[in-house]
Amino acid sequence: MKPIVCRRINGTQDKEDQKMATLKKGDQAPSFSLVDQEGKEVKLSDFKGKKVLLYFYPKANTSGCTKQACSVRDARSEFQHLEIAALGVSPDGVDAQKKFDRKHSLAFPLLSDPDHKVAELCGAWGEKKMYGKSFMGIVRSSFLIDETGKIMGAWYKIKPENTVPEAKKVLGK
């Protein structure tokens, strides 16, 4: 798989450059490898032949991220029937991911992306504003990836409660 590369012009980064590459329907998902909450290496290629719901969330155990993760957990039996694997990604460390998983009985891989490289590849890292301040962080995003690694649906700035319904909509469910 050919990874998507985000470039900086002349080694600088201004407001225009902060717009990361975004994925859209039909694009090849970038290949990646991250560590999950159990310390196990997980690669997107491990799921070849299955659909994958890949979603990015800002911080484990916050209200929106908990709502999003629990909605994915609650769709587990339906996802199993549809042969969809779920992968959550955040900049949190492995220990924080493990606590999040245990606290909410999520039982699907939560991947640690502390240097946000995978988030950048997917366009899920960008400028955010809170209380009048600008900073870089995770843009809550989700992607439905088909069995061959192609994007079936991409949602940026998705509301936590819409992650599962939007994925199901693409599948006609």
Q: Model regions: which residues?
A:
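Chalcogenol-based redox active-site neighborhoods
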Residues: 3-6, 16-173
